[in-house]
């Protein structure tokens, strides 16, 4: 498989103001110590220090800078596949420019001048430097070499697909950022060489800007600022360094006590997918004005083509973190906020449907399982928005299949939420129907879908009819994971009048219910919610065991929901190949053998493709996240599509 994962890093080296020899040695040392990376970025004017002041006009300092650059280039000659960007003051046509210099495998590749020079408050850059806004497609002489020089340079590596553009400090703070144009011209990595002094509130503001730029430009953004070795005559510099990708903060470090290097592995395919999906992300119309220079930025393991096992080993070695439950935030506080926001979206969607139809009675079947519990919580929250909503709950037990545990949980839940309660036992109706069609009437063993589906359809049949009697809406309970796998009965639990859980994955359903349990301030409700969260997932369509316990467990049939949701996320959110998803799964679940993951993935893709016909006629329901399967919105797939391409890749991975 093509390897488009690269290790990048920010470096805050030790530094002495105006001591170019020392600073050069520090840069070379950190390059050698991090030679396994593909790209490193250093602070603004790191060869001299940012706080040299009028010393920037001294020939000895500027001559030493050029010598230092060639020393760094010579040292990089043995560092295969590593590109670095360092900051240096350079002369050009009787002017001095604050520059970023690309160096790769022994060569000074290109020089980019700073465009936006701050000359306000504590900053006075235009005293020494000239803006590079008019420097386009020039060459600058360093020693005997003539090197591409201009604000319109992007550094490209054909192996990994990395394309690097630059901001230099203030460039991030202005409305028309150079990095925005660079990304529109194809850059997927932005390096910001900075020298930003520290003040109250500035750290948070910087972080916000870096995250926003990496999100709106769909790029990896590497920000690194000079540290406390700068002169403290009037200012203190904090060495703030950050790496963000697609709006997500990966590293964040400030006030290092010594040299500080932060490295991460970034996935260039994720950037490509986001840009391709966001059709308003248009490439710069005049990007032909850019000069593209070749550099070497190796993928991890320095392998262009890589096997699943090799990439998994490389990612584990780098400590590459993959969330086992990508729909669920790792941070407890963020997870709690996410869960309540989802519930808020669901409730508002349902409330809008109630207002628009004028129908205030909500009819819902309560099984004592997670999905119907969440749907009932949504109804309960919608009632807070539309106080004259009336909730009518039905238990629809089937003797021998419904356990007393789930049945009692359903009753306790409805009592706790002040729901009008009804019960209709379905066994007699199901038996009569099965007799009509010539079915024996009892469960005929694994594969007797007629027996199972007759119960699901009977429940829907009853709910629809009682909704008509009550002039009500049937609220659907099925979740996103079930829809992805087709784990629902066509025209049974598949159908409703408004499906509130349709874009909530199973791995999140439990967290929402559990979160609500702890914030509801109602002890009886908390108790039953936690019981339900700890109940095995089952449709209870087959007889329970001899002890009255649940025998039919959903995950025994379709695999663990953790893995299924993992596959679903990366198929829909990023469109990754089965090989890539297997790599991520094995990285996230190191305890699993590859063959177990392969088996689960084969089952997932088979079901995902052959069950599309159920998703092609889904009821309305609110979108709550970036991954959803509505045939009217985010997922428009033909029901007749073949899974062979995906299955073959899974088998070969």
What are these regions (language model features)?
Residues 1-365, 381-386:
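Enzyme catalytic cores with a strong preference for nitrogen-chemistry domains
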Residues 56, 160, 217-219, 231, ...:
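ATP/NTP-dependent adenylation/nucleotidyl-transfer catalytic domains that generate, transfer
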């Amino acid at each position: 498989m093509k390897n488009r994962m690269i290790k990048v890093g920010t470096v805050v080296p030790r530094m002495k103001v105006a001591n170019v020899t020392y600073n050069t040695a520090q840069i070379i040392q950190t390059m050698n110590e991090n030679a396994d990376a593909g790209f490193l970025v250093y602070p603004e004017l790191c060869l001299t220090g940012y706080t040299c002041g009028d010393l920037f006009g001294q020939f000895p300092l500027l001559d030493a800078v050029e010598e230092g650059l060639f020393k760094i280039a010579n040292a990089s000659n043995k560092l295969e596949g590593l590109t670095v960007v360092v900051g240096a003051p350079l002369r050009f046509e009787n002017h001095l420019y604050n520059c970023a210099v690309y160096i790769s495998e022994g060569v000074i590749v290109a020089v980019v001048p700073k465009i936006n020079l701050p000359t306000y408050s504590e900053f006075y850059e235009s005293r020494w430097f000239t803006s590079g806004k008019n420097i386009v497609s020039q060459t600058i002489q360093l020693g005997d070499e003539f090197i591409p020089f201009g604000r319109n340079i992007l550094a490209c590596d054909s192996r990994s697909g990395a394309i690097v553009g630059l901001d230099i400090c203030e460039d991030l703070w202005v409305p028309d950022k150079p990095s925005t144009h660079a990304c529109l011209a194809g850059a997927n990595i932005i390096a910001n060489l900075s020298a930003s002094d520290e003040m109250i509130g500035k750290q948070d503001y910087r972080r916000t800007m870096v995250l926003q730029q990496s999100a709106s430009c769909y790029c990896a953004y590497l920000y690194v600022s000079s540290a406390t070795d700068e002169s403290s005559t009037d200012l203190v510099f904090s060495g703030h360094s950050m790496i963000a990708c697609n709006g997500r903060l990966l590293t964040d470090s400030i006030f290092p006590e010594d040299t500080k290097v932060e490295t991460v592995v970034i996935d260039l395919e994720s950037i490509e997918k986001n840009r391709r999906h966001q059709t308003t992300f248009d490439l710069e119309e005049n990007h032909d004005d850019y000069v593209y220079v070749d550099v070497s930025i190796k993928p991890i393991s320095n392998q262009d083509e890589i096997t699943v096992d090799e990439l998994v080993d490389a990612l584990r070695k780098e400590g590459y973190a993959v969330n086992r439950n990508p729909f669920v935030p790792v941070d407890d506080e963020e997870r709690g906020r996410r869960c309540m926001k989802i519930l808020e979206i669901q409730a508002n969607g349902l409330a809008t449907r109630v207002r628009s139809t004028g129908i205030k009675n909500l009819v819902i079947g309560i099984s004592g399982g997670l999905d119907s519990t969440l749907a009932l919580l949504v109804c309960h929250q919608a009632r807070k928005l539309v106080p004259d909503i009336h909730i009518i709950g039905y238990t629809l037990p089937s003797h021998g299949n419904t356990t007393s545990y789930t049945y009692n949980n359903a009753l306790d839940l409805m009592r706790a939420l002040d729901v009008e309660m009804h019960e209709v036992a379905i066994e007699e109706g199901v038996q009569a129907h099965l007799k009509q069609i010539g079915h024996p009437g009892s469960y005929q063993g694994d594969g007797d879908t007629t027996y199972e589906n007759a119960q699901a359809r009977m429940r829907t049949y009853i709910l629809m009819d009682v909704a008509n009697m009550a002039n009500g809406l049937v609220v659907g309970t099925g979740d996103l994971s079930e829809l992805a796998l087709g784990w629902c009965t066509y025209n049974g639990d598949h159908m409703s009048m408004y499906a509130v859980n349709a874009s909530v994955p199973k791995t999140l359903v439990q967290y929402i219910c559990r979160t609500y349990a702890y914030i509801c301030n109602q002890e009886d409700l908390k108790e039953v919610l936690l019981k339900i969260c700890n109940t095995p997932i089952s449709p209870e369509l087959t007889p329970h065991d001899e002890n009255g316990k649940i025998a039919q467990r959903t995950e025994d049939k379709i695999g663990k929901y953790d893995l299924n949701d993992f596959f679903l996320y990366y198929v829909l959110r990023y469109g990754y190949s089965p090989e890539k998803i297997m790599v991520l799964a094995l990285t996230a679940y190191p305890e699993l053998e590859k063959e177990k993951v392969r088996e689960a993935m084969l089952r997932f893709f088979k079901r995902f493709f052959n069950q599309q016909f159920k998703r092609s006629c889904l009821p309305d329901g609110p979108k709550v996240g970036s991954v959803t399967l509505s045939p009217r919105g985010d997922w428009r797939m033909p029901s007749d599509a073949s899974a062979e391409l995906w299955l073959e890749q899974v088998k070969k991975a």
